[in-house]
């Protein structure tokens, strides 16, 4: 009993000694002048807070030029207003941490490594990144897969990379031009991302193999890639699902890179690198091994970007998906795209993908591209099942002719070589509405599907369109009720 009392007393003393340990990085030698490399000082402050059992590392106003920053358990990194962590350029002698080994080849390079990030952590818990400051990767963080700079030191291709962590909070920060990913979060459970702004080159927020995640009140602009995307890849070496995820009250867009943060929201660039229009959407997929379950997306706005995409093509089961109260404006492809494919980037003998139990309601879309309609597609012998779309209004641009359909005028050539070679309906292709070609209907095009219910649907076009409203192919039990 005496030993227990003594331990309790020591615990109380520890809590009194470190109730809110706060360490200013300037006391560790950081300059914040935009010229001096400050990552050693920031890492020293993080390490001291970690050794003390936890605390807050504070960055006051200034520009902190940095290479790799190593996050630690029980440590909060707080950037005050005017504080900027800026990615430092690689030199002949200085650079970022090397990308670690990952022996699983079923996902892209970018999804396979975390150490080659501006800020990274692995096997951590209770990590917080917060404040009114900025993470700036302008002209430094790579948009591609290059691992090393021209002179040898490693380059970084993302702002934040976290693997196998829990109880992570990212709140209030702004991420600008952050390379391949602003946030790559793989195997991170009990995750909260709130009030974050991303205005970036490629993917904004990537949540991969995560459980119990909330993304709330975020603005993500990503012309060249997806804004908020859920994945369930094989990057951890096993098919961990992404489940119990809530995305709510977010805005996604495909404006010119940098124009969301500066307030201009310009649209001079009308195409992403794949040849389609601006990306900037919310998506599930494409990496899809472990499964998508219990996902809720609600009260979100899409502007000048692609529509909602729900994709499983690598063997994942997608079920219990709930989507509601979306507003979309100026949508450059399908407002709604549900795709069950057969790409199968997975170990040999992996099970086929499945889609069921999807409920979508209260969707309002204006200015949508008519070429690809709202598109639901399974594959022969493996249909999309049990989808309900209710109370959906879509105003398409129209203007497509039957000759356009026959000749596939305006079809994106980026996908044509694969589409001609890989299976009926391109089932092994990268899933994208334009990979299916211009659809034979302008409202809904549904193939290889069963038990699909379209309730209280209102569809119209701005310009006359020669195609019918609906096209069904190899379907069973399709029910439609239209609202005039």
For every predicted segment, state its role.
Residues 2-12:
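Bacterial N-terminal signal peptides that target proteins for export
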Residues 21-484:
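Extracellular/periplasmic carbohydrate-active domains that bind, remodel
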């Amino acid at each position: 009993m005496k030993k227990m009392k003594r331990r309790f007393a020591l615990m109380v003393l520890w809590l009194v000694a470190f109730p809110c340990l706060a360490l200013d990085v300037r006391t560790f030698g950081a300059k914040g002048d935009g010229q001096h490399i400050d990552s050693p000082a920031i890492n020293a402050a993080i390490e001291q807070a970690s050794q003390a059992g936890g605390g807050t590392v504070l960055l006051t106003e200034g520009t902190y030029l940095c290479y790799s920053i190593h996050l630690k358990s029980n440590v909060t990194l707080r950037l005050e207003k005017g504080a900027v962590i800026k990615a430092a350029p690689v030199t002949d002698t200085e650079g970022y941490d090397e990308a670690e080994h990952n022996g699983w080849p079923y996902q892209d390079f970018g999804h396979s490594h975390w150490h080659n990030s501006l800020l990274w952590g692995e096997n951590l818990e209770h990590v917080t990144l917060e404040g009114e400051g900025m993470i700036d990767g302008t002209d430094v963080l790579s948009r591609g897969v290059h691992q090393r700079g021209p002179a040898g030191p490693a380059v970084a291709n993302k702002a934040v990379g976290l693997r196998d962590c829990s109880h992570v909070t990212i709140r209030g920060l702004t991420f600008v031009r952050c390379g391949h990913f602003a946030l790559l979060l793989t195997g991170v459970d009990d995750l909260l991302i709130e009030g974050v702004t991303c205005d970036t080159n490629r993917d904004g927020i990537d949540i991969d193999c995560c459980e119990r995640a909330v993304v709330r009140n975020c603005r993500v602009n990503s012309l060249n890639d997806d804004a908020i995307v859920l994945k369930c890849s094989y990057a951890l070496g096993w098919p961990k699902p992404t489940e119990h995820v809530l995305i709510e009250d977010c805005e996604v867009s495909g404006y010119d890179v940098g124009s969301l943060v500066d307030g201009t929201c310009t649209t001079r660039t009308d195409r992403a690198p794949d040849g389609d229009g601006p990306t900037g959407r919310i998506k599930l997929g494409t990496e899809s091994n472990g499964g998508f379950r219990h996902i809720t997306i609600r009260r979100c706005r899409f502007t000048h970007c692609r529509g909602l995409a729900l994709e499983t093509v690598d063997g994942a089961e997608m079920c219990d998906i709930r989507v509601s109260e979306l507003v979309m404006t100026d949508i450059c492809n399908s407002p709604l795209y549900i795709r069950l494919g057969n790409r199968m980037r997975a170990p040999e003998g992996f099970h086929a993908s499945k889609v069921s139990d999807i409920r979508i309601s209260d969707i309002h879309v204006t200015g949508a591209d008519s070429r690809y309609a709202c598109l639901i597609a399974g594959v022969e012998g493996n249909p999309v099942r049990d989808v309900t779309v209710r109370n959906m209004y879509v105003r398409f641009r129209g203007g497509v002719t039957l000759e356009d359909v026959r000749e596939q005028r305006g079809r994106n050539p980026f996908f044509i070589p694969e589409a001609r070679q890989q299976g009926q309906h391109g089932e092994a292709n990268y899933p994208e509405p334009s990979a299916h070609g211009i659809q034979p209907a302008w409202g809904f095009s549904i193939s290889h599907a069963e038990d699909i219910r379209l309730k209280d649907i209102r569809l119209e076009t701005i310009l006359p369109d020669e195609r019918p409203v609906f096209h069904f192919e190899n379907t069973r039990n399709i029910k439609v009720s239209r609202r005039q």
